[in-house]
């Protein structure tokens, strides 16, 4: 028997229309580095999104399902594209500006982007790629920047504001099947070519609902959200859509992602919640420790992308009164997989054991742990296996190209359709996930597993260590052993023996690294994670000055 409920499609245009009308006075605030940030109300964003849709459709001929690329920072114009492009029936394709040029060109060509919106400050990045992007017919420049490098390009160059000027501020948004594609984001491609994840209107909508729940980020009207995580990375973790839905204003940092301007914009604009990878927050914490700022407005910072060192969580809370919330997700999970809030009634030191985990899964995300023989493991907090997930905002395949079939590689999807995350961890009986490592980063030493993440977190708790990465390197006797790569804090001079002794207070002796090296900075991927494949290559090529301790 079918229900008597209405079947209304859950689409991005509904988020746009709702935010622009019900929450029309909320603002998208773009930091400019000048005395006053740039402000646009949600109502203005709605009108300009309609103008953008008219420009793309009427002037540039963008059709249904066509991918439109954006090479942009987090700013109000990017928000207009976020909402306007999917609402008109096209597909928003955010381009990761931190990818190597050859990968960026591959992605644009694979998606067959014909129109690319680019911030003027990013023209030096796009211009050299254009000769390798034969299908790009239109480049729309957003904001100031030297356009000379675009002279002579095969693509027509347009000015964003001129393109929008005089166009209708209302667009008759089409009724779209909620299962249709709304946005496209490619993984960072640390192994092989990047893989495209196509988000549906429905997945973005229900993901936004989840982001706004109390068990996630609890956004509401009156909040100001600061997505430091880029809009080109997994939809800025869903904050733009969720904020527009809830009526929470948005503080967009544009290109000002360094610790000092972040601290200044927090003190000036007063956001209530922020989201970024650990390396961003580590820099901000050091800035706040060095120079006192009024950041009492910031009740929560969300940390994801890689494991959050407990020392970072305690530093924010104990020295600045800012609560850190640990979360886990990936491009394929939209990205909200789980968020770490302690159970009700838990306080004091007991809560830290829960907050250090990746958290619990919401009702819409199912999870299981799979052992080395393919068996499902119990949720007992001890059995470690590869995490697999499924749910309404979890990818079931990768984009195979405009004429290609969806891709379901066996190493990424199980025979029964679950996403194989590549993360190894445990789950407690009450559902708290603790990730011990990436499957490819676990150090397999003498038949035992050593967690690189655990060693890194303990090392970064030492006051003389700013960053630490641990990777597996070949060992004749044990197969693999850990190599500790550290970045020393400014002015700190701890020796390797001291760091090893400090680590020895936290882990078993057989887990302690014998090989140590100090570097100016740990190489990072395009989304701010430690790039361990680079460290392994540097070690193999003899590029690291390694000290051997016995």
Identify the role of each PLM range.
Residues 364-389, 429-430, 492-496, 531:
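Conserved beta-loop-beta connector loops within the AMP-binding
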Residues 205-224, 234-272, 287-288:
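Conserved AMP-binding/adenylation subdomain of ANL enzymes
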Residues 59-63, 167-179, 184-226, 238, ...:
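Conserved adenylate-forming
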Residues 245, 271-276, 286-353, 366, ...:
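Gly/Ser/Thr-rich phosphate-binding loop
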Residues 87-165, 176, 277:
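Structural core segment of the AMP-binding/adenylate-forming
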Residues 321, 351-355, 393-422, 439-440, ...:
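Conserved ANL (AMP-binding/adenylate-forming) active-site segment centered on the GW(Y/F)…HTG consensus within
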Residues 28-75, 79-83, 100-108, 159-162:
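Conserved AMP-binding/adenylate-forming core of the ANL superfamily
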Residues 99, 105, 116-120, 391, ...:
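AMP-binding/adenylate-forming catalytic core of the ANL superfamily
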